[in-house]
Amino acid sequence: MPCCRSSCTSWADDARFVFRNFPLTDPHPRAQPAAEAAESVAAHGGEDAFWAMHDILFTNQDALEIDDLIAYAEAVAADPQTVADDLATRAFADRVRRDVRSGLHSGVDGTPTFFVNGRRYDGLWSDPAAFIDELRAAARQGTDGGG
C-alpha cells in the first residue's frame, strides 16, 4: 500500500516500516514471480528501485506476465536481462518463501497486514487516512510507555 508507506516515512520517530512479501497466489497466480522480480530489482537497484517496482506492480496487478515484469524492471532503470535471468533461475524464490512462512507464523492470512507493538491490524479500510492515524497512535503508545 503506497499510501501507508509514504505516511509511515513522515512519522519515522514513532514507527519503523518493514515490508515483507506475501503474494496471494489464489487470486493472483502471477503474484509469486512478481514478488521475485521486485526482489531482483531491489538486489540490483536498491531500495528506491524496489519501491518504484512495487508501485508499478500494485498498479498493474492484472498484467504480471514475465514480459510485463521485465518491462516494469526496465521502467525503473533495472537491467532487464538481469531480472529476466533471476526470474528464469528463480533466484529470489527462497527469499519470497521465507517472507510468506514468516507471515504465516505471525498469523498473516491476507494483505495488507500491519503489526504495531505486536498487535496485528489487517484487512481493507474504507478510510485509509483514519487507519493510518490509528496505526500512528498505536505506535506512539509503544514509544511513550502507554502500551
Indicate where each model-derived feature is located.
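Structural alpha/beta surface segment adjacent to cysteine/selenocysteine redox centers
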Residues: 1-74
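C-terminal cap of thioredoxin/glutaredoxin-like
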Residues: 1-9, 70-147
